[in-house]
């Protein structure tokens, strides 16, 4: 099944030690064809961006960068594996690694949140 990420909102539900996002970080995804990008902010993140592609197996291959509330700039790469959960929401299982401004690697989970009505 192919997932359309356009206009989906996600929030982190778990993250490894050394990761900067938390349950206050909100991600806003966009998509055009196989191109995917997002902005994110909240928690310790003042503002961040991601850009990448949807691979043939459905995983997302992303590069990210953000500015923290303390003014630090960090970046890295992430591979996200989607899972469709209740009410057709999407959960992304992420493996990430810092490539700039930080050290280490980890895993996180972000889940789609439905907009308030």
Q: What is each model feature region?
A:
Residues 1-21, 92-98:
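Tryptophan-anchored aromatic micro-motifs
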